[in-house]
């Protein structure tokens, strides 16, 4: 049972952040002539939208797996060309080329019991936070929403109700196991006609420019290798005036909460071992939270990607935070 929380007990006031601008060159995607067979599902996007290239559309209940001319790195495609180029995988420093594969292994391992562990680790509060994040999009009937790192579909369930029959939610995740869990969950709830599933790299998005009214990413950004690149990709595919909403673990705003939270999170790997039989994956998740940028740093990154009106809302005294940014509307020419 989910504990009851009022908005006031979870969040603090919005904090204004000075905007900084910045854009990147778009990474062009070309669908392969003979893509791998779709592993999972796409709903009836072929009748509802033109965001996915026709050559990549599949039948009802299949996931679109979209690749680019520079293939997504996986644990089958590791490159060690630049051993000096490293990034963090939890506390470990690993070659950049290895991180995507390591993260993939984590989520393949935990996918089946991911939702159960979310409830255990957050004491159910993740559901309240996701509802708040979905509300922050201001999504309405007819909107097209991209849910990045959408995994097991919690955000899609909420957003699909907001956009209605004339809108569409695109659940995009690089991990097929997580998408499979999300597909099954939504099917069990009878959500079929306005959700599409795309297996693709969030750092190289396969959608046309200015496709979406809003983009969400809930508890997924910290797993990206190049967060700045991912944010620039989001800027590229969101419409002018569109909202970016990021829900992520963050830095508690007082020492007492920080120490209590660290103590609680230390037992997550042990709980993970009991519930899923996998301790190491949850050790990574704990470490990835500690290595994630704090509220101000992430706000600056969002601004540097080009978003304006950047702000964040602390939840549970900063244990998590919702960041928002808006893509500026084009100024009318004289």
Language model regions located:
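C-terminal alpha-helical "lid/dimerization" subdomain adjacent to the S-adenosyl-L-methionine
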Residues: 98, 247-305, 311
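Conserved alpha-helix/loop element of class I SAM-dependent methyltransferases that forms part
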Residues: 113-116, 122-144, 158
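N-terminal auxiliary segments of SAM/dcSAM-dependent transferases
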Residues: 71-104
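A short glycine-rich, Lys/Arg-flanked "PGG" loop and its adjoining helix->strand segment in the class I
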Residues: 228-243
